[in-house]
């Protein structure tokens, strides 16, 4: 299944590697370097299946921006979008926080990066997001249909 994927990674080499890997799999990929670029893309994009976020982003003002902050925004406003965290700075505590507080779908360390495991994680995340979106669409249709039937009975 092909998905719409956003990659937020400040290191150009990693951004390009991940983007190329996923485009070869047939996914529609947008790769950006900053939280602001990610927010801008999400504001204009519908049905985002997956966001792949670096935990630590060094913004142009040289402050460490936390990818967890963006993950929290995604979880709050885009419940069907899955999030995979990727980091070169992750500890077990960071990983647990990503899963417990923000319901990350998966977590990868750059030092131990396995492209096959990563592709599998992406595939599962995209599939799950699509299934959830389909279920929401079907539920919306059923609610609409029931309301129309109720209106007819009232007439």
Feature locations, PLM:
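CheY-like receiver
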Residues: 115, 119-155
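Conserved phosphotransfer cores of two-component systems
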Residues: 43-46, 73-81, 101-102
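Alpha4 helix (beta4-alpha4-beta5 surface) of REC/receiver domains from two-component response regulators
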Residues: 65, 69, 89-108
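Two-component/phosphorelay signaling modules centered on CheY-like receiver
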Residues: 11-35
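Short amphipathic helices of CheY-like receiver
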Residues: 36, 63-72
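Two-component signal transduction core modules
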Residues: 51, 83, 106-108
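Acidic, metal-coordinating helix/loop segments flanking the phosphotransfer/catalytic sites
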Residues: 6, 30-50, 54, 58-60
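Conserved active-site segment of CheY-like receiver
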Residues: 10, 86-91, 111-112
């Amino acid at each position: 299944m092909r998905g719409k994927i956003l990659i937020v990674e400040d290191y150009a080499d990693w951004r390009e590697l991940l983007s190329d890997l996923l485009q070869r799999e047939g996914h529609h990929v947008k790769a950006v370097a900053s939280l602001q670029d990610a927010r801008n893309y999400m504001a204009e994009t519908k049905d985002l299946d997956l966001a792949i976020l670096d935990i630590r982003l060094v913004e142009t003002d040289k402050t460490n921006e936390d990818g967890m902050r963006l993950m929290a925004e995604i979880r709050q406003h885009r419940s069907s979008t899955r999030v995979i965290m990727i980091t070169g700075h992750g500890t077990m505590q960071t990983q647990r926080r990503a899963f417990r507080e923000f319901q990350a779908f998966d977590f990868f360390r750059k030092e131990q990066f396995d492209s096959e495991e990563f592709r599998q994680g992406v595939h599962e995340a995209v599939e799950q997001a699509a299934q959830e979106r389909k279920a929401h669409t079907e539920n919306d249709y059923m609610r609409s249909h029931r309301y129309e039937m109720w209106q007819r009975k009232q007439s």
